[in-house]
Regions:
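Beta-strand->loop->alpha-helix junctions that form or flank phosphate-binding loops
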Residues: 36-37, 55-60, 99-106, 144-146, ...
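N-terminal leader/targeting and accessory segments in enzymes
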Residues: 1-100, 104, 219, 249, ...
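Conserved hydrophobic helix-helix packing surfaces used for dimerization/oligomerization
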Residues: 8-9, 75, 115, 141, ...
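A glycine-rich beta-strand to alpha-helix segment
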Residues: 71-72, 423-454
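Nucleotide phosphate-binding/pyrophosphate-handling subdomain across enzymes
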Residues: 2-8, 18, 25, 29, ...
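C-terminal helical cap/extension that packs against the catalytic core
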Residues: 50, 237, 376-434
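Phosphate-binding loop of NTP-binding sites
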Residues: 25-31, 62-67, 79-224, 228-237, ...
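Short internal beta-strands
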Residues: 31-38, 220-224, 357-360, 382-392
């Protein structure tokens, strides 16, 4: 179904961060947009305020009449929705056009110049950073992001004048194979989603195939330390980047007085005096990749400087809630061992002489089973680790797989404990912290506003 032929859109799994951006896109086109989600959230409430019709019961009778015409209704679903979902079955049996979120984004990369960011981790921050640079430049852009931009308060940026669309390319369920990027950054390929891929080799092969999809005339910007093999089409340029080496990299890095500055080294034009608006060490590497893609498409040196200086970050990505001499409290979506490592390393670099404590909620039984030793090694960079029960998301429990696997493998010297998430607020009330971070992609983040209030009241 062509986008121009659509009159109504129904989203199954409307409250997901990626799906909500699709909802906002179609709402901006003045279409009827409705959908289902399992539970209400701040995001679904925001969508309802913006005009979307959402219900929270798996019930075909609750589908609006405006979304029951198969000829002009597009149904979009997330891979997390089971195939036997009653509403999905209804649409399938009645001949509706049903597409994954990634298929919709793939259509947009055929009508716009898609600037895509893929990778196990780093893709949300890098894509949001690139979108901000582009949006405030003379080029402008549309953007479908995997997190809520602090600059815009949304995960979707609309431009009526730009041919560029920045997209976070999701490797889960091989969704990014629907895209046809003009250019792409690949930030990392540390194995993940082994419940889907089975093996590390299959995971890396999925990224290799993704590189084949970049359009001739475009470019691949790949982190130089990745072990994957790219296989681009003729006419696609390949650039390497990292913090310290590659075609694009940083020099003269200075981390002092709570700020970070560096020079951006580029085969096109070096740009001195880059200042990070969100001064987190990992954002040096993310910034190099974001600036590389923006510069390759025509952003000027001043636009790069301004974009990086005014970049405000992403909700739940090294997201400071309290930051003063007595207490630092932040929330971070990190849920893969390498992400945990980067988060812990950044905290260590920023707060060398302070006690660093993490409350971590592991995400998925399969991920915990596959990587519990890696989680323990990464968390052991911190002084204290408080482990919550595993957040199951779409999964059923696996016998013998609990947070204790991580607990038992933490290195000697690390203070450690286990707690139910319902007891977290009581713990925070009962003791003092120096630097505290809530880690994970589960629902522990719902407690962050209350934790913030408790800590501020002390």
């Amino acid at each position: 179904m062509e986008i121009k032929d659509i009159k109504a859109v129904y989203l199954v799994g409307a409250g997901g961060i990626g799906m909500s951006a699709i909802a906002r896109y179609f709402l901006s086109k003045k279409l009827v947009v409705a959908g289902y989600d399992k539970t209400p959230s701040n995001l679904t409430h925001e969508l309802e305020k913006e005009g979307m019709l959402i219900h929270y019961e798996e019930n075909v009778d609750l589908i609006p009449e405006a979304c029951k015409d198969a000829k002009n209704t597009l149904v979009v679903y997330t891979p997390a929705i089971p195939a036997e979902h009653k509403e999905l079955v209804y649409f399938r049996e009645n001949g509706f056009t049903i597409e994954k979120r990634a298929q919709v984004l793939g259509t947009l990369t055929r009508t716009h110049k898609g600037l895509c960011v893929a990778g196990t981790h780093g893709k949300t921050s890098t894509s949001t950073m690139c979108a901000h640079i582009m949006h405030q430049s003379h080029l402008d852009c549309n953007a479908f992001l995997g997190g809520i931009s602090k600059n815009y308060g949304t995960n979707y940026i609309l431009s009526d004048k730009s041919d560029f669309v920045v997209i976070e390319a999701d490797e889960f369920d091989r969704s990014f194979h629907w895209l046809r990027p003009w250019m792409s950054v690949i930030t990392s390929t540390d194995p993940d989603h082994l419940d889907i891929y089975g093996t590390k080799e299959a995971y890396l092969e999925s990224f290799r195939h993704y590189t084949e999809l970049i359009q001739p005339g475009g470019a691949l910007i790949i982190h130089k330390d990745l072990e994957m093999k790219q296989h681009v089409q003729d006419g696609v340029k390949i650039y390497e980047y990292s913090q310290d080496e590659g075609d694009f990299h940083a020099e003269n890095i200075k981390i002092e007085n709570g700020g970070i500055t560096f020079d951006f080294i580029s085969p096109i034009e070096n740009v001195t005096g880059i200042e990070l608006g969100q001064p987190v060490p990992i954002n040096i590497t993310n910034g190099v990749a974001a600036m590389a893609m923006a510069q390759l498409n025509g952003c000027t040196a001043d636009e790069l400087r301004n974009g990086m200086k005014t970049y405000g970050g992403v909700d739940r990505r090294f997201d400071f809630k309290i930051k003063n001499d007595k207490l630092v409290f932040l929330s971070d979506y990190a849920h893969h061992p390498k992400e945990i490592y980067q988060s812990a390393k950044s905290i260590r670099e920023l707060y060398k002489n302070r006690k660093n404590t993490a409350i971590f909620q592991p995400h998925l039984y399969t991920r915990t089973r596959d990587f519990y030793k890696d989680f323990a090694n990464s968390l052991s960079l911190l002084d204290e680790v408080i482990l919550c029960d595993i957040y199951p998301a779409r999964e059923q429990p696996i016998p013998g797989v609990t947070s204790k696997l991580i607990y038992d493998n933490l290195k000697p010297g690390v203070e450690k404990s286990m707690i139910h998430k319902e007891d977290v607020l009581g713990l925070v009330k009962s003791r003092d912290f120096d630097v505290l971070v809530v880690l994970g992609a589960g629902d522990l983040d719902n407690y962050v506003p209350e934790i913030t209030k408790i800590l501020e009241s002390k």
